[in-house]
Amino acid sequence: MSGDYQLRCPTCGLRITDRYSSFCPAGHPGLLVTDYPERTLSLSGQPGIFRYESWLPVRGRLPFTGGTVTYQSDGLAEELGLAHLFIGFNGYWPERGADLVTCSFKELEAVPSMLRATERTAGILVVASAGNTARAFCQVSALTGIPVVIVVPQSALPRLWTTEPAPAALVIGVDGDYADAIAYSTALAAVDPRLIVEGGARNVARRDGMGTVMLDGAVTIGRIPDHYVQAVGSGTGGVAAYEAASRLIRDGRFGGRLPILHLAQNLPFVPMVAAWEEHTRDLQVGPGTPYTEEAEQWVSAPVLTNRTPPYGVPGGTYDALEATGGEMYAISNGLARAAGTLFTDCEGIDLDPAAAVATASLIQAIEMGTIEPGSRVLLNITGGGYDRVVEDHTLVPTPAGYRVPAGNPDDEIRRDVITWVNDHA
């Protein structure tokens, strides 16, 4: 528990008390960073993510035992010729002790985010998602009764389910893509002052929750890995890994070198890969570029599409790649499918499509020589175990309360949402 932490602006260094803050009071656009009073990582006796609660921006706990399970690979490591491949598995795989029942590392974001919101505000979070994040927030709401408003593209609605009913989750499906869902959620939050924009990449609880993947990896390996591999849509997971590794360096017990970030996107929607190849902060997305809404429809991992990622902002993905000497990879659907099959054959568990993209990028990095056979590698499997979870749990669909066009909420939606807030605040 970290009741005395502060938030720091990466541009001006100003430190502030957290009031569910997302921006520097001086107006700087960078991502706020959490400064914890505990310089060394203290491991609690709690299971899952709360093992690392000393570096989470929360005071209390929720009834939640899931977290990353890191183990040293035998099968995939031998197949790829790696001596020290460690897999950070985030999903459902009880035989390995993995208990993220929505089969995604997004639960690592949802748990501290909802706890931080209850501790720092009296409001209700409004969360925009491409699918996996929404499912995770609905699951936490189902377990705790904490109300939440979820806004997703209508195409993501089939991916919304929980293992318990979630009556305190209001789901709105937008006729559009993830960017449309983000815009609608922002407009919706303005309807009532008790509604709070969750913040996405600007939410330090999300980043520090994701950062526990790096913490668990370093604790398991005994040091910071040489390489960190993940598929990204917003790039926030890479930023989280970089921030967590920076804290481990200040700790002093896990080595003094940052891991090289290897971040992958799914062809044909790879705007961050293109920008990084040009070594520019400027992201080219939308009409007149290859990275349009139409391109988003062709990827095998829709959660990896984001037209407004925090790529070029101070403290964002560009800076994390720059600081670590990182690499980016553009992975086709075919390569991702083949890599996912290889992983399942070698390790014995099914993968989320995004995790298959990450596995394919690991293979590509080895072939390119950017990852050496003798180095210590942490592969973040951001989701998996969908086939396994249905053996133990009945999945409860989370229906949409409303299906709406993209744009601003109309008067009827505004009235209904205010009524819903009155009933749940």
From Swiss-Prot:
Pathway: Cofactor biosynthesis; coenzyme M biosynthesis. It comes from the Archaea. It is an enzyme of class 2 (transferase). GO terms for molecular function: cysteate synthase activity; pyridoxal phosphate binding. Its cofactor is pyridoxal 5'-phosphate. It holds the Pfam family PALP. Pyridoxal 5'-phosphate binds at residues 132, 382. InterPro entries: Cysteate_synthase, TrpB-like_PALP, TrpB-like_PALP_sf. The keyword Transferase applies. Its EC number is 2.5.1.76. Keywords: Coenzyme M biosynthesis, Pyridoxal phosphate, Transferase. The modification N6-(pyridoxal phosphate)lysine is found at residue 106. One of its GO terms (biological process) is coenzyme M biosynthetic process. Gene3D superfamilies: 3.40.50.1100. It catalyses: O-phospho-L-serine + sulfite + H(+) = L-cysteate + phosphate. HAMAP family: Cya_synthase. Specifically catalyzes the beta-elimination of phosphate from L-phosphoserine and the beta-addition of sulfite to the dehydroalanine intermediate to produce L-cysteate. Homotrimer. Belongs to the threonine synthase family. Cysteate synthase subfamily. This is Cysteate synthase. The lineage of its organism: Archaea, Methanobacteriati, Methanobacteriota, Stenosarchaea group, Methanomicrobia.
